[in-house]
Amino acid sequence: MMLAIPHLPQPVIAKVHAMATAAGCQLVAACDLAVASSEATFATSGITNGLFCGTPSVPVGRNVGSKRALDMLFTGQFIDAQSALRDGLVSRVVPADRLDQETMALANAIAAQPPQQIASGKAMFHKHMEMKLADAYALATDFMADALQTEDAKAGIDAFVNKKPKPDWTGR
């Protein structure tokens, strides 16, 4: 499942109400975006039971960086939602009583964008994250040149330049 997430055309959003440990923390880190309740906590706590969290170390390390990830992995200590936001494990922290509404608002904001651009942009993003910097820029430059040729991009740019209402996206 973790390997499938980057290849899905739709963004995958984690919604974290309370505690995400070990594989739960791994899933949060593997998702494209994550919205956490202000009450949420996160840990790779396997080490406290004698098992280093090997598979969680992959997406957690790629999201929060090696020093922070190793601190979490070596100690098993929990971090709070604000620390998870600061460290890049989650993309938003919201009050607990607004978690459902704010997560849905994020999903709706994404769904209101051109679907083909979201899908191809997500694929390009995940691909360039595995590349060297110069290769990533080359990929992104080619992507932008191709994206500018789509009907949605042309309609969106025209609407912006000519101060027209946002167009209905066609996915083309």
Predicted features by range, described:
Residues 3-118, 150, 155:
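Crotonase-fold acyl-CoA enzyme core
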Residues 76-82, 101, 105-172:
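C-terminal alpha-helix plus adjacent terminal tail
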